[in-house]
Amino acid sequence: MVNKSRMMPAVLAVAVVVAFLTTGCIRWSTQSRPVVNGPAAAEFAVALRNRVSTDAMMAHLSKLQDIANANDGTRAVGTPGYQASVDYVVNTLRNSGFDVQTPEFSARVFKAEKGVVTLGGNTVEARALEYSLGTPPDGVTGPLVAAPADDSPGCSPSDYDRLPVSGAVVLVDRGVCPFAQKEDAAAQRGAVALIIADNIDEQAMGGTLGANTDVKIPVVSVTKSVGFQLRGQSGPTTVKLTASTQSFKARNVIAQTKTGSSANVVMAGAHLDSVPEGPGINDNGSGVAAVLETAVQLGNSPHVSNAVRFAFWGAEEFGLIGSRNYVESLDIDALKGIALYLNFDMLASPNPGYFTYDGDQSLPLDARGQPVVPEGSAGIERTFVAYLKMAGKTAQDTSFDGRSDYDGFTLAGIPSGGLFSGAEVKKSAEQAELWGGTADEPFDPNYHQKTDTLDHIDRTALGINGAGVAYAVGLYAQDLGGPNGVPVMADRTRHLIAKP
């Protein structure tokens, strides 16, 4: 999971249904089962939910931990640990009778540490632009040359016609042209590095030069005030930056039931990769285990109205690359054929919360990740809120902030939702009172660390949230209608997602 999320209490619009926990499993009497999309669908959903056990999900997590242990403690894309994770999921699905696809995609991953600019004995912090070159350990040094300050500074080599740019470190203000154009103009005139001064005084802006740009020199950004200070000075200037770009190929894993309408596909996904720093057993082995066990228990040819497609994404931790690549590969008809997408990323945090994605947009405007989410997402949220009520948990919202693999689907207009147990954000006192756990501590103190191991999985959260995967999949596999349904084919609006 990437980026930070903001969480607020959800507006609950469902009746409380009595439930109880028994040895890590949740059981409901016939009378307490919720009628959401119809009684037959609810019966099927509860039956599927009851077949997805905590022990089975823990067994999948144990396998993923073993894979990480055998591969330098990681399952990150581009490592043998990721390849072994793909093989495990593929073999498990094939052993359950699924036809499995492993579409390959290419990506470039940029990594950088904070850079510095030194002039006249003073050092200031700078931020690499994505896909910048790095410098040698001692940096690159040259006289500081400032481009003219105008509406389009440094956008053309001619902007430097009367300036001694060759061998210099060039300072240019942010303007109307792309950063890659500024880099190219300075590089053509022989600059050894480029500093771009932002037009605001917040954090250094970052930005990208573009994955397909032939970058020739290091490029960093500084704030407006730092840029102003630099512009008033002269003399030898050194830029230091540790940065690299890695190109790789990776695979997603896709499997679909052989039964059910292919014009109304219910899609459930979880990212399969970890960060390089750790094994990723909560983030996101927990989501993988829940989706995988749901597939195993549903089977390859269930008696369902709508086909179910299971997805295990690669390179989420490097910017949602696998899922975004998949959505970009689909035409309008294929996008319309996906009735909804359910995303499961971090379900068993050790200090867990019980969050649903904010499909009804009940968060305050400034807390929403997207100004609008696709029609139908509110119904999905209500389904998960109702499920958590059954499990004895009161849901709170987490925003659609582009943090996980739902992002490409929502941008394409596909109704989306899911469950989430929290990451690096600290649990409030009110949340600790609501759910238990420790206030003022992160939901997952092991987030993106080597300590994200099997030993730190919360079994109760895994049992509740993992069962929620099966419940929602089973419900929508049988019925897409009702108050918590999604638009029918004729009413679906979809958008092509362009490749960068």
Curated annotation (Swiss-Prot):
Chemical reaction(s) catalysed: Release of an N-terminal amino acid, Xaa-|-Yaa-, in which Xaa is preferably Leu, but may be other amino acids including Pro although not Arg or Lys, and Yaa may be Pro. Amino acid amides and methyl esters are also readily hydrolyzed, but rates on arylamides are exceedingly low
Cofactor: Zn(2+)
Tree of life domain: Bacteria
Residues reported in the UniProt entry to bind Zn(2+) 2: D283, E317, H448
Compartments reported by the entry: Cell membrane
UniProt-annotated site: Transition state stabilizer, residues: Y447
EC number: 3.4.11.1
Lipidation sites (N-palmitoyl cysteine): C25
PA domain segment(s): 140-231
Residues where Zn(2+) 1 binds: H271, D283, D345
Role noted for this protein: An aminopeptidase; acts on free N-terminal amino groups with a very strong preference for Leu in the first position.
PANTHER family reported in the protein's UniProt record: METALLOPEPTIDASE M28 FAMILY MEMBER, PEPTIDASE M28 DOMAIN-CONTAINING PROTEIN
Protein name: Probable lipoprotein aminopeptidase LpqL
Organism: Mycobacterium tuberculosis (strain ATCC 25618 / H37Rv)
